[in-house]
């Protein structure tokens, strides 16, 4: 029988032997021996355990997982083997206030028991299933094998130096055609024959991506490839689960394939490289990763995408879901790929003028604030200049010195809030909050939009950012990346006024007012409500 340890955060009343159905014996440990500590920090941990004497170590909750592995998300890894012997699991105590996690617990428990009893065969990732190709002849032979294979589809992925085609280039492509092995091919191995073979492959086979919008953009921009038929495992999963944040290839591979966190060795290498060279995480360049380090991770991307497609494509047996996928999500993906490539046209000169005008307005607003006698008096009493960006000073000025009545809204630490909503209400009592709010609003427009847009414009004065089909539970589009185009200021036209239509074109603003009610009236077959929309009437006044 395997020797097992179980580690929880601190002493609790949870009977873990009962929770695991008495399926195995274990030694129980706590990170912190003091049950009175509310939030256990690293300095509170006094655990004394020799991990080498155990075959398996069950880590209960996120604290234990992070302590031993530096991984934060226990839900993502629950029931999966991490490194050589760690088995993370969510804390069963959470089921009392989060009953929807019951399935996660049950599945994780069954998986852990099988690991400990030796009923799960260890999966080894080596060159037999994930390999690299740097030789041109070997590259072309592998692509020819994919063409000759009798399967209808292939899985395709790319490794790039940037998030946008104009900001980076392709380091290599990953390809899987049989669901048994994946290859990572360096673009340095490409020749004219390679490109001809790939063009033919993409024309004859269904190409399966995970996040097609990203990969297609690079393939189309840098190689002019086309994809007449493509699928997207990310969007297929979105049909199953609309909740944002859970559609990544890593997360789904951990959950639905036996290969788990296959990318961890590469990220461990990256962490070590950054540490040795004193490089910040945001400054690390993907091109610095050696081919021999990259190849396994990249090849596994294609293999796992293939496996996910085999599992998720069954969803399309549901005709309603298949219709949404085939008629909305896939065409929408194609449309948004083109939209992102087209970009948003800005007038660079007007942006620069607006930037200076806004700075002038900010300077004037600050000058007006400092001319207020309340500010000069406050500075004399405190013996230092007033900083409007300091929430501590602002709180003292508004509530202690001027004596305004707090709104009752508090911060997470229990202090009186000074956010925009609070300042708006306090403006009824004094001019100072109004002046502060004016400075904040103008500074946000300049810092968040004008200053950010200008350096990110491409040479054609267009901003190319992201639009997403899978970012909301409501089915609405979301925007992310270089700039969230859905959050341009409404109350100040200075930013939107810098968007410039191309010659011969116009910018059109359209808003589907009460679209959800419109759809509901049709689905409910409510004739009276439908008549309101047919006649162009006002829904709200009619209901009132």
For the regions a language model picked out, list residue spans one by one.
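Short glycine-rich phosphate-binding loop at a beta-alpha junction
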Residues: 56-60, 206-213, 387, 511
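Alpha-helix capping/helix-boundary segments
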Residues: 63-65, 214-215, 393
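Conserved catalytic alpha/beta cores of large enzymes that bind or transform nucleotide phosphates
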Residues: 498-520, 533-544
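Short active-site oxyanion
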Residues: 3-4, 53-56, 202-207, 383-385, ...
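Conserved RNase H-like, two-metal-ion catalytic cores of nucleic-acid enzymes
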Residues: 4-6, 13, 18-27, 122-255, ...
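Conserved "right-hand" nucleotidyltransferase catalytic core of DNA-directed polymerases
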Residues: 118-186, 244, 255-257, 269-494, ...
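Metal-dependent phosphoesterase core characteristic of DEDDh/y 3'-5' exonuclease domains
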Residues: 69-98, 105, 109, 176-178, ...
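A polyanion-binding, active-site-adjacent surface
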Residues: 1-122
């Amino acid at each position: 029988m395997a020797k097992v340890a179980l580690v929880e955060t601190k002493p609790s009343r949870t009977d873990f032997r009962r929770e695991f159905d008495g399926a195995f014996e274990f030694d129980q440990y706590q990170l912190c021996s003091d049950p009175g500590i509310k939030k256990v920090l690293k300095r509170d941990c006094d655990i004394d355990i020799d991990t080498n004497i155990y075959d398996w170590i069950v880590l209960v909750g996120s604290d234990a997982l992070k302590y031993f592995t530096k991984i934060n998300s226990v839900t993502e890894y629950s029931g999966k083997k991490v490194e050589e012997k760690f088995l993370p699991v969510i804390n069963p105590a959470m089921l009392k206030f989060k009953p929807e996690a019951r399935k996660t617990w049950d599945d994780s428990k069954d998986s852990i028991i099988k690991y400990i009893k030796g009923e799960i065969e260890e999966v080894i990732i080596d060159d037999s299933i994930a390999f690299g190709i740097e030789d041109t002849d070997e590259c072309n032979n592998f692509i020819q094998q994919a063409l000759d294979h009798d399967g209808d589809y292939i899985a395709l992925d790319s490794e790039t130096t940037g998030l946008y085609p104009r900001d980076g280039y392709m380091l290599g492509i990953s390809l899987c055609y049989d669901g048994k092995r994946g290859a990572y091919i360096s673009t340095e191995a490409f020749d004219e024959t390679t490109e001809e073979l790939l063009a033919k492959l993409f024309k004859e086979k269904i190409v399966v991506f995970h996040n097609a919008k990203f990969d297609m953009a690079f393939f189309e921009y840098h190689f002019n490839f086309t994809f007449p038929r493509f699928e997207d495992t990310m969007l297929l999963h979105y049909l199953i689960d609309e909740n944002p944040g859970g559609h990544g290839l890593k997360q789904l591979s951990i959950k639905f394939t036996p290969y788990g966190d296959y990318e961890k060795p590469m990220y461990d290498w990256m962490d070590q490289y950054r540490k040795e060279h004193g490089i910040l995480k945001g400054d690390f360049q993907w091109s610095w990763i050696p081919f021999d380090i990259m190849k396994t991770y990249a090849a596994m991307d294609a293999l796992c995408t293939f496996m996910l497609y085999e599992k998720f494509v069954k969803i399309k047996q549901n005709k309603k879901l298949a219709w949404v996928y085939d008629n909305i999500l896939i065409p929408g993906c194609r449309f948004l790929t083109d939209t992102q490539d087209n970009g948003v046209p800005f007038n660079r000169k007007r942006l620069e003028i607006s930037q200076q005008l806004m700075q002038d307005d900010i300077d004037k607003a600050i000058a007006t604030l400092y001319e207020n006698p309340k500010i000069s008096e406050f500075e004399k009493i405190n013996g230092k200049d007033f900083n409007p960006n300091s929430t501590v000073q602002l709180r003292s000025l508004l509530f202690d010195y001027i004596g305004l009545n707090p709104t009752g809204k508090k911060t997470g630490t229990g202090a009186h809030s000074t956010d925009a909503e609070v300042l708006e209400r306090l403006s009824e009592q004094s001019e100072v909050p109004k002046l502060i709010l004016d400075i904040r609003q103008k500074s946000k427009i300049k810092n968040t939009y004008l200053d950010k847009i200008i350096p990110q414009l491409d040479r054609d004065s267009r901003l190319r950012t992201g639009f997403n089909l899978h970012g909301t539970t409501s089915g609405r589009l979301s925007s992310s990346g270089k700039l969230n185009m859905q959050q341009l200021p409404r109350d100040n036209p200075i930013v939107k006024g810098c968007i410039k239509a191309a010659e011969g074109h116009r910018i059109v603003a359209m808003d589907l007012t009460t679209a959800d009610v419109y759809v509901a009236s049709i689905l409910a077959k409510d004739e009276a409500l439908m008549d309101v929309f047919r006649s162009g009437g006002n829904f709200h006044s009619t209901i009132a």
